[in-house]
From Swiss-Prot:
Name under which the protein is recorded: BTB/POZ domain-containing protein KCTD6
Keywords on record: Cytoplasm, Growth regulation, Tumor suppressor, Ubl conjugation pathway
Tissue specificity statement from the Swiss-Prot or TrEMBL entry: Highly expressed in cerebellum and brain.
Region (Interaction with CUL3): 10-110
SMART domains for the chain: BTB
Function text: Probable substrate-specific adapter of a BCR (BTB-CUL3-RBX1) E3 ubiquitin-protein ligase complex mediating the ubiquitination and subsequent proteasomal degradation of target proteins. Promotes the ubiquitination of HDAC1; the function seems to depend on KCTD11:KCTD6 oligomerization. Can function as antagonist of the Hedgehog pathway by affecting the nuclear transfer of transcription factor GLI1; the function probably occurs via HDAC1 down-regulation, keeping GLI1 acetylated and inactive. Inhibits cell growth and tumorigenicity of medulloblastoma (MDB).
Subunit structure: Homopentamer. Interacts with KCTD11; KCTD6 and KCTD11 may associate in heteropentameric assemblies. Interacts (via BTB domain) with CUL3; initially a 4:4 stoichiometry has been reported, however, electron microscopy revealed pentameric states with a five-pointed pinwheel shape. The interaction with CUL3 is indicative for a participation in a BCR (BTB-CUL3-RBX1) E3 ubiquitin-protein ligase complex. Interacts with HDAC1; probably indirect as the interaction requires the presence of KCTD11. Interacts with USP21 (preferentially catalytic inactive form).
Chain residue ranges for the region called Interaction with ANK1 isoform Mu7: 1-104
Superkingdom, natural source: Eukaryota
Domain BTB: 12-81
Taxonomic lineage: Eukaryota, Metazoa, Chordata, Craniata, Vertebrata
Biological source species: Mus musculus
Amino acid sequence: MDNGDWGYMMSDPVTLNVGGHLYTTSLTTLTRYPDSMLGAMFGGDFPTARDPQGNYFIDRDGPLFRYVLNFLRTSELTLPLDFKEFDLLRKEADFYQIEPLIQCLNDPRPLYPMDTFEEVVELSSTRKLSKYSNPVAVIITQLTITTKVHSLLEGISNYFTKWNKHMMDTRDCQVSFTFGPCDYHQEVSLRVHLMEYITKQGFTIRNTRVHHMSERANENTVEHNWTFCRLARKTDD
């Protein structure tokens, strides 16, 4: 095979099935780092497997391979601001043995710009339940959203006006909805809508907590807490 034929093959599209996710690239990209596993695999030094459609098959994390492939294309590591799967991506880099990518992921310098910070939203649901009534009967419930993101609080106050009949209280850094006595499904409906609204503003759930308390002989109090976070850029005052 002459150099012209080899050059054509190196630029020819190649489709990979990585954990069920399909990616199309070129042999030139895949062999960018000859000492890597992909370099050996597509350089003919490593056995390859194919799926029933004839695509090269690699049994690894499909969604994370996009970051590996983009690094092969540009030699730069570019991640979303809210990226949280660093440990998993390090394992993928180790598997593919792409040394420059491994170095980037182990670099102590921050992967995100220094002018970013994390915004936090706390959503809590406190329900007082009667021990002697139907399990879904609620004596009183309070849903509280706590955050320093005032635009989010204003949006909730303006968007959820139909819930005013359940005594909405707006204070500095908080919006609270108090129900009672009410059916459990009313609180669940509002909580689901609040979570959808918060996530549409770019927040993702960081953690959840549940706490059970007994205040009186005939009451149980259950408190649920959800923490949402998003990265934002600092602005000069």
